[in-house]
Amino acid sequence: MTHFEFYFDISSPWTYLAFSRVEGVAERCGVDIDWKPVLVGGVFNAVNETVYEQRANPHPVKVRYYVKDLQDWARFCGIEIGAPPVFPVRAVNLMRAALVALDAGCLPAFSRTAFHAYWGELRDVSQPEELAEICVRVGLDPAETVEKIAGDEIKSRLRAN
């Protein structure tokens, strides 16, 4: 079967929007999804370091348009996107855990739960107790997940994506 790669980071509202629709698109097109958790901060560091300056000194008009555009797309996708109190969030452990979820066959449920926790419930998903709760919600053992995300194999896989 044909497949396509879907790169995403829980800390990105734009990948949350795409995630909310990707499974339906794949089903309609008869393709499989090759899930690729990434750290979008690493991508920014490689291709657009100015993003940090733009965040530190935002232009008010651009910010208003950005928020409006994001909310328009969220309504279109049928999801809620709020303004998390911690943004950007340090999502490295969460994205490593996404690889554990991929191996366990529950990555879509894990990611859906994590996206909603951060963007819908506005929780600080960088905190260990939040990661543990997300794991429990999707049937992953939190202690086992924490052990795996500390290992070199998972770290290397996330860097490779």
Model-derived regions, located:
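C-terminal cap of thioredoxin/glutaredoxin-like
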Residues: 2-5, 10-32, 99, 104-106, ...
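Structural alpha/beta surface segment adjacent to cysteine/selenocysteine redox centers
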Residues: 18-118
